Amino acid sequence: MIAYIKGTLNSLGDESLIVDVGGIGYEIVCPNPFVFQDLLNQQIHIQTYHHVREDAQILFGFQNRDEKYLFTKLISVSGIGPKGALAILAGVDISGFIAAVENEDDKFLTSFPGVGKKTARQIILDLKGKLTSVFSITDEQQKSSVSNVNNNEVYSEAMEALKALGYTDKEVKQVLPHLKKDNDALSVDEAIRKALALLAK
């Protein structure tokens, strides 16, 4: 199995990136490839999960081991496949997600694409108590899932508004990491204005 890839980041797409290793280009599917955009044409070390099916072999890539570990736990949950796990990781703060699981916060979990109440309950049933042994969660983070779900809803609404204005999925994904990096509590209007300013650069 391929645990990580180290090479030159050659290109980015909407769902994947390509890393050149000794003249061979490895396509790696990521939650949001544009979190790596500042490393384009530079050396990159990316954690990978080698997913083998009867009809395909796919490399999934992650920013760090924590993100990779959470991916492996998510795909162990009944009803969540690799695509569903990636959709969750694309919009989640790991500590906030774990706090939501521990708090049995259905509202937070159903804020992710493709996660209904039944799947949210299954996530809680399968993962509660199993993530805190690996990830340390503070009391403050334990209480923070309400603000996190509000942030997720803000980002989601802002991204849909940008698409309605004619921006492509690729352009929207490019600005999302910059919005999240500031970690500010924004209204939808503020998030849209900030995203438009970034897109205008």
Swiss-Prot record:
<feature type="region of interest" description="Domain I">
    <location>
        <begin position="1"/>
        <end position="63"/>
    </location>
</feature>
<feature type="region of interest" description="Flexible linker">
    <location>
        <begin position="143"/>
        <end position="149"/>
    </location>
</feature>
<keyword id="KW-0233">DNA recombination</keyword>
<dbReference type="GO" id="GO:0000400">
    <property type="term" value="F:four-way junction DNA binding"/>
</dbReference>
<keyword id="KW-0238">DNA-binding</keyword>
<comment type="subunit">
    <text>Homotetramer. Forms an RuvA(8)-RuvB(12)-Holliday junction (HJ) complex. HJ DNA is sandwiched between 2 RuvA tetramers; dsDNA enters through RuvA and exits via RuvB. An RuvB hexamer assembles on each DNA strand where it exits the tetramer. Each RuvB hexamer is contacted by two RuvA subunits (via domain III) on 2 adjacent RuvB subunits; this complex drives branch migration. In the full resolvosome a probable DNA-RuvA(4)-RuvB(12)-RuvC(2) complex forms which resolves the HJ.</text>
</comment>
<keyword id="KW-0963">Cytoplasm</keyword>
<dbReference type="GO" id="GO:0048476">
    <property type="term" value="C:Holliday junction resolvase complex"/>
</dbReference>
<feature type="region of interest" description="Domain II">
    <location>
        <begin position="64"/>
        <end position="142"/>
    </location>
</feature>
<dbReference type="GO" id="GO:0006310">
    <property type="term" value="P:DNA recombination"/>
</dbReference>
<dbReference type="Pfam" id="PF14520">
    <property type="entry name" value="HHH_5"/>
</dbReference>
<dbReference type="InterPro" id="IPR000085">
    <property type="entry name" value="RuvA"/>
</dbReference>
<dbReference type="InterPro" id="IPR036267">
    <property type="entry name" value="RuvA_C_sf"/>
</dbReference>
<dbReference type="InterPro" id="IPR003583">
    <property type="entry name" value="Hlx-hairpin-Hlx_DNA-bd_motif"/>
</dbReference>
<dbReference type="GO" id="GO:0005524">
    <property type="term" value="F:ATP binding"/>
</dbReference>
<keyword id="KW-0234">DNA repair</keyword>
<dbReference type="GO" id="GO:0009378">
    <property type="term" value="F:four-way junction helicase activity"/>
</dbReference>
<protein>
    <recommendedName>
        <fullName>Holliday junction branch migration complex subunit RuvA</fullName>
    </recommendedName>
</protein>
<dbReference type="Pfam" id="PF01330">
    <property type="entry name" value="RuvA_N"/>
</dbReference>
<dbReference type="InterPro" id="IPR010994">
    <property type="entry name" value="RuvA_2-like"/>
</dbReference>
<dbReference type="Pfam" id="PF07499">
    <property type="entry name" value="RuvA_C"/>
</dbReference>
<keyword id="KW-0227">DNA damage</keyword>
<feature type="region of interest" description="Domain III">
    <location>
        <begin position="150"/>
        <end position="201"/>
    </location>
</feature>
<dbReference type="InterPro" id="IPR013849">
    <property type="entry name" value="DNA_helicase_Holl-junc_RuvA_I"/>
</dbReference>
<dbReference type="GO" id="GO:0005737">
    <property type="term" value="C:cytoplasm"/>
</dbReference>
<dbReference type="GO" id="GO:0009379">
    <property type="term" value="C:Holliday junction helicase complex"/>
</dbReference>
<comment type="similarity">
    <text>Belongs to the RuvA family.</text>
</comment>
<comment type="function">
    <text>The RuvA-RuvB-RuvC complex processes Holliday junction (HJ) DNA during genetic recombination and DNA repair, while the RuvA-RuvB complex plays an important role in the rescue of blocked DNA replication forks via replication fork reversal (RFR). RuvA specifically binds to HJ cruciform DNA, conferring on it an open structure. The RuvB hexamer acts as an ATP-dependent pump, pulling dsDNA into and through the RuvAB complex. HJ branch migration allows RuvC to scan DNA until it finds its consensus sequence, where it cleaves and resolves the cruciform DNA.</text>
</comment>
<dbReference type="GO" id="GO:0006281">
    <property type="term" value="P:DNA repair"/>
</dbReference>
<dbReference type="InterPro" id="IPR011114">
    <property type="entry name" value="RuvA_C"/>
</dbReference>
<dbReference type="InterPro" id="IPR012340">
    <property type="entry name" value="NA-bd_OB-fold"/>
</dbReference>
